[in-house]
Structures are given as C-alpha cells and as structure tokens.
Amino acid sequence: MEISSAGPVGAQPLLMVPRRPGYGTMGKPIKLLANCFQVEIPKIDVYLYEVDIKPDKCPRRVNREVVDSMVQHFKVTIFGDRRPVYDGKRSLYTANPLPVATTGVDLDVTLPGEGGKDRPFKVSIKFVSRVSWHLLHEVLTGRTLPEPLEPDKPISTNPVHAVDVVLRHLPSMKYTPVGRSFFSAPEGYDHPLGGGREVWFGFHQSVRPAMWKMMLNIDVSATAFYKAQPVIQFMCEVLDIHNIDEQPRPLTDSHRVKFTKEIKGLKVEVTHCGTMRRKYRVCNVTRRPASHQTFPLQLENGQTVERTVAQYFREKYNLQLKYPHLPCLQVGQEQKHTYLPLEVCNIVAGQRCIKKLTDNQTSTMIKATARSAPDRQEEISRLVRSANYDADPFVQEFQFKVRDEMAHVTGRVLPAPMLQYGGRNRTVATPSHGVWDMRGKQFHTGVEIKMWAIACFATQRQCREEILKGFTDQLRKISKDAGMPIQGQPCFCKYAQGADSVGPMFRHLKNTYSGLQLIIVILPGKTPVYAEVKRAGDTLLGMATQCVQVKNVIKTSPQTLSNLCLKINVKLGGINNILVPHQRPSVFQQPVIFLGADVTHPPAGDGKKPSIAAVVGSMDAHPSRYCATVRVQRPRQEIIQDLASMVRELLIQFYKSTRFKPTRIIFYRDGVSEGQFRQVLYYELLAIREACISLEKDYQPGITYIVVQKRHHTRLFCADRTERVGRSGNIPAGTTVDTDITHPYEFDFYLCSHAGIQGTSRPSHYHVLWDDNCFTADELQLLTYQLCHTYVRCTRSVSIPAPAYYAHLVAFRARYHLVDKEHDSAEGSHVSGQSNGRDPQALAKAVQIHQDTLRTMYFA
C-alpha cells in the first residue's frame, strides 16, 4: 500500500510501505486453523454505478429498501435477471452492464410509509467504471503491485471493496448490521444486562486480501442492544424501581437526571394510535410531570390555549393517564415542544447501545460471551455451514465460491527469553507457557524504603488498627524476601474520609517528612478518592502513591502482596528484572530507544471530553525503565498532534539517563485501524524525524514504525488437540504466523504472546509501516516477543509489547487527572474527566505531570 498525503499528487514524496523481507523461521512449528475461509473469485470485470437517492439523509436500511424496490419495479425495462449488489450508500455493482445511457437515468420509487402514507424517492443511477478482478489476482499473487493509492480515489473503485459488497449484500437485508458485524434479535435465549440493555449475538464478516487468495474472516460476536419494552419498564430498570405502582410521587431530580442520560437519543414508538406506530427520537425528559407540563394547543377556531399533556390525552384520545405524576419525553426537535407521556411509548427494537456499559454490565457481558477456544472454533464452523454462502443468489450471480472449512496454517512457537533477577544468587527465571514465578528470587535492583506513610480512607470500623498492623507486617515480610526492604514502621498512619481531605493531608506529609518515599493509600472500594490521590500525587505534589483496596488489606494473600511490591519497586526507581543480555536481538548492539504510543478517546456520545495521546520511551539498555509524555487533543482525533515535541522530550531524557544518542528508534503504535494507516504514518513519521532534526540538524537515527492491533477478528486454533494449552484450550504463548493469512506482500505478522486464561486468545497483529533498520522477520518477531516479557506489573508475558502497554496506562491515568473536583461528580464507575467549560490550557495543565514524578514510572 502506498502512502500519500491529501495534498496535490506529487507535492509530497509517496511513502512506500516496506515489502516483506522474507519469512520467519525461528521456533517450533505448530499446525493451526484460522477463522479465515477462502473465497474463489472469477477473473472478470464488474460494473460500478453511482446511486444517488433523494431525500439523501436516510439511514442505510431505508436506502437498501429503496434500491431493492427499484430493482423489482424496473425489472422489465432495466434490470432483467441481473442481481445487483449495493453498499447502502452510493455504490451499486452488477456482473453485466445495465442498459442505461452514459448520462445516467432518473427513476421514481415509492415505499409504503407509516399509517398508509407512501414515501416517494428519486433515484439516479450513473455508470462510473469497470472494476477489474483480473488485477486483483495479479496483486494477490504478488505478480504486480497495485497502482499507488491516491488519497482522493473513491474506495468504491477498489476491487476488494467490490468483493466485500457482494458478500455483505444478503446479510445486510436479513440482519441488523453494526460495523462489520451482523446481529439478530434474541430468539430462544435471553441475556439481560440490566439497565434496559441485553446481549445480542451475531457474527463478524470481513474480506481480506491474503497470500495468493482472498479470505473471508468470520467470527462470532456479541454486543449490547436496548431491550424492546415499554418506556415505563425501561425507566424502572434504569432507576432500580421494583414496582412502579408503589411510586406515587414524581421522580426526584437525581432520578430524572439519570433517566434522561439513559434515554436521550433513543428511538421510541407510540402505542396510543392503533396500528400507526409512529417513531420519534427522544431529545429530553421534562422537569414537570404530565399533569403539569403544558404546551400551546391551536384550536380549530385558530385560538391558542395552554393545555397540560394529561388534559390533551384525555380530550383527544379519551385516555386517562395512569401515571400523570411521571414526566414526559420530549421528542423530535427541542424547539418544537412535542411531548409524549412515558406510558404511551415503547423502546424501538434493534437499537445498539453505544454508551459505556457499567462495570456490572461489562462483567455480565464477558460471562455471557467468553468461549473456550475449542467451543469458539466449533461455533464459527457451525456459523459458516449455516450461512451457506454458496446458496446465496448474489454470491452465485458474481460466480464466487466460498470454502466452508477453516484455513490451515503452519505457525511457529518462539522461544521465551530468560529473565535476570538480582540479589546474592542472581537467579534466572525461564518462563513456561508465558508465566514465571518470583518465589526465591530478588529484584534485579531493589529499592530500600526508609520513610513511608499510610493513609486509610476506609472507616475504622471496616479496617481496624490491628488489621492495618497485620497488613504492614505481611507486606514488610514479602518485600524483604523480594529484595525491597521496607524499614521500620510507617512515619505516619491516619484514617481519613472523602476526596476533599486528600490534598491537605498530602501537603502536610510533604512539608512534615522530608525524604518521604511512598504513601500507601487504602481505599474502600470504588471511590472518587482514587482520582484525587493520583491527581495530587502525580500532578500537584510529585509524591509516589500506591493504592490498595481494603478487601486486600483485610484478607491478604502472598500473591497480592507480591504484586504490590512489583509496582512499588518500579515507582521508586527500582528494576524488577531484565532480559538476559546475551540472548537479546542484535538491535541492542547500539543505543536504541523503544517508544510506545496510544491515543484513547472519550466514550461514545461524549462530545465534550478530549482525546488523550500518550507516548513513552525507554530510558536504559535493558530496556526496563520508561519515561512518559502525555497531551490532550481534539476529541476523536487519531493522529498524535504534538508527537514531535513529545518524542523530542523523550530523546532528551534518554540522553540524560544514558549519555547516549539512540542510533535507532523502534516505535510501537497502538490503536490505529487499517483505514487510517496512511494518514497517521505520513504525519507521525515526519513528526519523529522533525524531533530528531530539532535536536541536531544531522541527527538521523533509523526509524522502525510498527502498528499494533488487538481489535481484529482473526483467531487461531490448534489443529492438534494435544497442543492445546490450559483450561480454555488455547494456542501456546509465543505462537507466530506470517504466512497464508497475512498480507500478500507487506511486512505483517500475528503473534500471540500471552497465555490465554479465559475465553479465546486474540493474537496481536503487527504491521510494519516503515523500517529504516532493515529488520529480518525473525529479528522483529523475536524482539517483539521479548518486549512482551518486560511489563513490570506481573510475572507473565502480556499480549502487546511493554512500551505500547505503558502508553495505554499513561493515557488511562490522564483520564483520572482530568477528573475535575469542582465540576465532576466523579462517580466511581465512570472516570469522567469532563472538560466542563475548561479551556484547552486548563486541560493541558491538568494532565501535566509534576517535575519530581516525570522521571519515574508513576503509571506502573
């Protein structure tokens, strides 16, 4: 794939994505199955038409109905036996040309509307171009490179898009599409999530070019939908009201606000007009009940009078409201004052929930959807058999054949790196199945903790003093064994309550105890105190804090205490372990910096909050210590706006820490989807170069830019059941695939670096978009796998390289720094970080880390 910016063609050099340098050979071969199904495509040209539908603001579902009706209606004159496929927007493909003039043709189509009224549409169809699947074969076999992709060239002319539309046409008519997945209403199963939401199961389907062939990627998927039910019931679920008839009083303000937040933006249909089930979108909930909410009603004589909603429904529909004390829904446009009593409305079926799930809903969702690998494999196979693609008339029209067995792939299990610990006996740990153990080992570099404090935000009743004493004794014992001795008793140990007491207490500690190294904070479950502790510690005062849930203080376990020590040692400047130096790839022979970058976006439907960009960089040769930079930027912007200055900061810090200038920069970029590769690479690669040149005009280290993706639907299964690992029967940690299901000629690979605990492991996908350092496949795959073993929070290999993981933690922590005490009700379950009326400067300042914290791994 070529990269070009959106400027005029030729104004900027085209960035050519590197070709695959060869295949990896390291590791023990393993036979795998992938949830990819081969699609045989004929070597023909297909015909692309542009479809223009007026009115043009219709949802795709309506557009599809219009086009479907048009094909039926104009069968004799235009379409004959042809079965066109349509993408729901502007593109229509046919296997044979249509008899329409080059200028196009305008057609009138009507759909039956609600309540017997017809809905008229005007449709124009115009020939655009032929799309060649000959060429696709040439590209897939690597015989020809595709022509450089011009950024302004429409996706519809892309032959892969045409294949996708053919395979999507029928399911789009039968099911509810969401992104690349299809869902249908639950039949015979019921998975309520609470709060008016439920789980719908469906499947993901996407077409991807692979080596020598096109593959159809099929996976089972699940998402949250709103339950189709009366609005009164929806309200009861949201507000935890068990019996509406026992609520004779109007809603409290807090109840009304909560209900409004949940129902705003949803579609409802009315039930008081017989078969006329008119639909409306909710824009608000009234403050007043139906018995008091008035609106101006125009009488037949032209006079306007004020009527309450309850009166109006009694007079007009002879309907005595059962719940006149409840508020009304305001629907349609705010300024139009259309009010509906709750009791005449139902939630429209098939609305996907895009709002963030609560913690309870998320855990219910995971329980309902987690499948062991063998179960998922079986489910996907069943799905493909029942989809019966070869019987799909549109698939037949374009002469496709879809195989119904999974692709056989040979992967390799890479060897795990050994990890060097410290202490007198300098033990080495060898991971087995992605896990190792710290028992009998001491940190590579342990910190001695001489001055420390405890602040307990749980009540004295929850956590008595002797419980605290027991906890600190246990912690000191474990920490001594780990080579991080905590000396003596804490210099300060007090109970406190509420987020407001955090600042004053921390200030007192900072001023009273010079040389204080750590504050251990005990929290009573989910609480706004956490955000305030991190805001005060990380940004205002520069003090190291370690939070512990009170349940883990009351009931200590060696595992929990040991995990606490892993975090504390690193926050105070220690090193837990390092990769054994002699087995590291050759890239370590010269100074190299590893960068990890991520952008986290606010939850859907939250227009006000900024996106947060984080970049971390390694600060030593192991690499074990990292330094962080973080910025706020425009909501939903994927490109890291301020990357040049962030990388510059990290390069300066690297030089201060090591006295070397890196000769290589390895950049792991998380969270970019395929559609954004081009513009993100173009902007960010130049930003990294700019950072280097701003330090010295001839400083040009080699840059390798790798995108890490976890959000994809490729799953790998062991073909041989004896190779399955663990209770959930997954592929072993270290499984790598770079053939068959990967890109025809670009440098990408799948690596499952972690041991699956629950459900089916998802391998991470790595795509090299730039490589000045000329890595071989083996070198880069091994380097990536080794970096997955350097994550300090646990003694297991994680699913993405440590620098990418740390960037994610830094961005996530910044959300807490943005929680504004004055404006936010920082409800435990939702880190809000609202930018309520705060200007960009204030937001930027809120995420700025204190000078004393900047050099530490405060995010661990």
UniProtKB/Swiss-Prot annotation:
Q: Which reaction does it catalyse?
A: Endonucleolytic cleavage to 5'-phosphomonoester
| Domain of life, source organism | Eukaryota
Q: Name one GO cellular component term.
A: cytoplasm
Q: Which SMART domains match?
A: DUF1785 (SM01163), PAZ (SM00949), Piwi (SM00950)
Q: What top-tier enzyme class does this entry carry?
A: hydrolase
Task: Indicate which residues the UniProt annotation says bind a divalent metal cation.
Answer: 598, 638, 670, 808
Record domain PAZ: where = 230-349
Query: Do you know which PANTHER family this protein is assigned to?
Result: EUKARYOTIC TRANSLATION INITIATION FACTOR 2C (PTHR22891)
Q: Which Gene3D superfamilies match?
A: 3.40.50.2300, paz domain, Ribonuclease H-like superfamily/Ribonuclease H
- Pfam families, per this entry? ArgoL1 (PF08699), ArgoL2 (PF16488), ArgoMid (PF16487), ArgoN (PF16486), PAZ (PF02170), Piwi (PF02171)
Q: Which InterPro entries match?
A: AGO3, ArgoL1, ArgoL2, Argonaute_Mid_dom, Argonaute_N, PAZ_dom, PAZ_dom_sf, Piwi
GO terms under biological process = miRNA-mediated gene silencing by inhibition of translation; mRNA catabolic process; pre-miRNA processing; regulation of stem cell proliferation; regulatory ncRNA-mediated post-transcriptional gene silencing
Region Interaction with guide RNA, as annotated, extends over 530-567, 758-805
- What is the name listed in the Swiss-Prot or TrEMBL entry for this protein? Protein argonaute-3
Record-stated family: Belongs to the argonaute family. Ago subfamily.
- What range(s) does the Piwi domain occupy? 518-819
Known EC number(s)? 3.1.26.n2
What keywords are annotated for this sequence in UniProt?
Answer: Cytoplasm, Endonuclease, Hydrolase, Metal-binding, Nuclease, Ribonucleoprotein, RNA-binding, RNA-mediated gene silencing, Translation regulation
Q: What does this protein do?
A: Required for RNA-mediated gene silencing (RNAi). Binds to short RNAs such as microRNAs (miRNAs) and represses the translation of mRNAs which are complementary to them. Possesses RNA slicer activity but only on select RNAs bearing 5'- and 3'-flanking sequences to the region of guide-target complementarity.
